[in-house]
Amino acid sequence: MSILKIHAREIFDSRGNPTVEVDLYTAKGLFRAAVPSGASTGIYEALELRDNDKTRFMGKGVSKAVEHINKTIAPALVSKKLNVVEQEKIDQLMIEMDGTENKSKFGANAILGVSLAVCKAGAVEKGVPLYRHIADLAGNPEVILPVPAFNVINGGSHAGNKLAMQEFMILPVGASSFREAMRIGAEVYHNLKNVIKEKYGKDATNVGDEGGFAPNILENKEALELLKSAIAKAGYTDQVVIGMDVAASEFYRAGKYDLDFKSPDDASRYITPDQLADLYKSFIKDYPVVSIEDPFDQDDWDAWQKFTATAGIQVVGDDLTVTNPKRIAKAAGEKSCNCLLLKVNQIGSVTESLQACKLAQSNGWGVMVSHRSGETEDTFIADLVVGLCTGQIKTGAPCRSERLAKYNQILRIEEELGSKAKFAGRSFRNPLAK
């Protein structure tokens, strides 16, 4: 079934910034997709095209990306009469039309919007759920429900507090189903709110961009202490583990790291990569920390390699790998990390996202599917994580509707699968291992 019409528009993301939405029509109906946007972005990400017209939306408009879709991409795809199930062919055509390494002509936000809409249309064309269509595209015979990694304490570039490390997450690995994992996550979240309120007052329970709390604490260890206490209060000490996203590129300063980077600059407090690694190891020893994302700067390859070799936990590459097959191949060759963070808008098409995932998995890595801090009500990544069988997803706290939209969609998928539903649980790092 070919594409009859494509129409793009500017809509608003969860931070009140414009983003791209695409409507794609086939004889089967309308298929709509919206593109997310990150705050702490890796320098190697595909280009998100913004207007940079300071008189409009502080320069963050996306009318150029929208125009590229409406005036260039849409007519080309409609005239070619390509079948929407041919995801790779359509993505390839857009990439060739763009002609740049990082999608800077059309913008990754333009290409991705169309790519996501095509994928949704392809599923309906085949008469299967979206997660099944994605599983087919990836060559996966089965599907798996992921462990959710709830970002319940926000710091770094996502929050106005002093905390340097960006995300402190809870993973209910001891749950027996996704629905139970949601309940555990929600109960720990509410206990955490009470713990923070008692210790720091009601003001401290305001939430950050991803629905997590952002109490004004400086010590990263204090965030772990709060989590440990909330998990215990909720009665889930044996069932919940902790993950972190440090986003260390945000506080990398000339070969060292500044754990108080939101205060006036003072080089005397910078610490070395080895000192930072020792700090992480103390966290791993004292708390149930099983996963650390972006522990070092995106170009501090030596520090990554040393840490991954000795930490004994999941080390996730985000800014390091930016969902880019070339960066993933380099990181795999150097054993820099052992898990890929998969963000569709870092690479800018469904096909390349699937390739990045398969490449990571073929190197024995785990894969965690991720939202961005600027999100929409689009739920594509919920189906993506199930179809790709990655076993883990992070899409915020159990708070804020743009986050819950994804979690609720996974609940529906679990219900639809019925007795065939398989939850990753404690095997979240390698859920396909028999």
From Swiss-Prot:
<feature type="modified residue" description="N6-acetyllysine">
    <location>
        <position position="406"/>
    </location>
</feature>
<dbReference type="GO" id="GO:0003714">
    <property type="term" value="F:transcription corepressor activity"/>
</dbReference>
<feature type="modified residue" description="N6-acetyllysine">
    <location>
        <position position="285"/>
    </location>
</feature>
<dbReference type="GO" id="GO:0061621">
    <property type="term" value="P:canonical glycolysis"/>
</dbReference>
<feature type="modified residue" description="N6-acetyllysine">
    <location>
        <position position="64"/>
    </location>
</feature>
<keyword id="KW-1003">Cell membrane</keyword>
<feature type="binding site">
    <location>
        <position position="245"/>
    </location>
    <ligand>
        <name>Mg(2+) 2</name>
    </ligand>
</feature>
<feature type="binding site">
    <location>
        <position position="394"/>
    </location>
    <ligand>
        <name>substrate</name>
    </ligand>
</feature>
<dbReference type="InterPro" id="IPR020811">
    <property type="entry name" value="Enolase_N"/>
</dbReference>
<dbReference type="GO" id="GO:0044877">
    <property type="term" value="F:protein-containing complex binding"/>
</dbReference>
<dbReference type="InterPro" id="IPR029017">
    <property type="entry name" value="Enolase-like_N"/>
</dbReference>
<dbReference type="GO" id="GO:0003723">
    <property type="term" value="F:RNA binding"/>
</dbReference>
<dbReference type="GO" id="GO:0000122">
    <property type="term" value="P:negative regulation of transcription by RNA polymerase II"/>
</dbReference>
<feature type="modified residue" description="N6-acetyllysine; alternate">
    <location>
        <position position="281"/>
    </location>
</feature>
<feature type="modified residue" description="N6-malonyllysine; alternate">
    <location>
        <position position="233"/>
    </location>
</feature>
<keyword id="KW-0379">Hydroxylation</keyword>
<feature type="modified residue" description="N6-acetyllysine; alternate">
    <location>
        <position position="228"/>
    </location>
</feature>
<feature type="modified residue" description="N6-(2-hydroxyisobutyryl)lysine; alternate">
    <location>
        <position position="228"/>
    </location>
</feature>
<comment type="subunit">
    <text>Mammalian enolase is composed of 3 isozyme subunits, alpha, beta and gamma, which can form homodimers or heterodimers which are cell-type and development-specific. ENO1 interacts with PLG in the neuronal plasma membrane and promotes its activation. The C-terminal lysine is required for this binding. Interacts with ENO4 and PGAM2. Interacts with CMTM6.</text>
</comment>
<feature type="binding site">
    <location>
        <position position="318"/>
    </location>
    <ligand>
        <name>Mg(2+) 2</name>
    </ligand>
</feature>
<feature type="modified residue" description="N-acetylserine">
    <location>
        <position position="2"/>
    </location>
</feature>
<comment type="function">
    <text>Glycolytic enzyme that catalyzes the conversion of 2-phosphoglycerate to phosphoenolpyruvate. In addition to glycolysis, involved in various processes such as growth control, hypoxia tolerance and allergic responses. May also function in the intravascular and pericellular fibrinolytic system due to its ability to serve as a receptor and activator of plasminogen on the cell surface of several cell-types such as leukocytes and neurons. Stimulates immunoglobulin production.</text>
</comment>
<dbReference type="GO" id="GO:0019899">
    <property type="term" value="F:enzyme binding"/>
</dbReference>
<dbReference type="InterPro" id="IPR036849">
    <property type="entry name" value="Enolase-like_C_sf"/>
</dbReference>
<keyword id="KW-0324">Glycolysis</keyword>
<feature type="modified residue" description="N6-succinyllysine; alternate">
    <location>
        <position position="89"/>
    </location>
</feature>
<dbReference type="GO" id="GO:0031072">
    <property type="term" value="F:heat shock protein binding"/>
</dbReference>
<keyword id="KW-0832">Ubl conjugation</keyword>
<keyword id="KW-0597">Phosphoprotein</keyword>
<dbReference type="InterPro" id="IPR000941">
    <property type="entry name" value="Enolase"/>
</dbReference>
<dbReference type="GO" id="GO:0045892">
    <property type="term" value="P:negative regulation of DNA-templated transcription"/>
</dbReference>
<dbReference type="GO" id="GO:0000977">
    <property type="term" value="F:RNA polymerase II transcription regulatory region sequence-specific DNA binding"/>
</dbReference>
<feature type="active site" description="Proton acceptor">
    <location>
        <position position="343"/>
    </location>
</feature>
<keyword id="KW-0479">Metal-binding</keyword>
<feature type="region of interest" description="Required for interaction with PLG">
    <location>
        <begin position="405"/>
        <end position="434"/>
    </location>
</feature>
<feature type="binding site">
    <location>
        <position position="293"/>
    </location>
    <ligand>
        <name>Mg(2+) 2</name>
    </ligand>
</feature>
<dbReference type="GO" id="GO:0005640">
    <property type="term" value="C:nuclear outer membrane"/>
</dbReference>
<dbReference type="GO" id="GO:0005938">
    <property type="term" value="C:cell cortex"/>
</dbReference>
<dbReference type="GO" id="GO:0005737">
    <property type="term" value="C:cytoplasm"/>
</dbReference>
<dbReference type="GO" id="GO:0006096">
    <property type="term" value="P:glycolytic process"/>
</dbReference>
<feature type="modified residue" description="N6-acetyllysine; alternate">
    <location>
        <position position="202"/>
    </location>
</feature>
<keyword id="KW-0460">Magnesium</keyword>
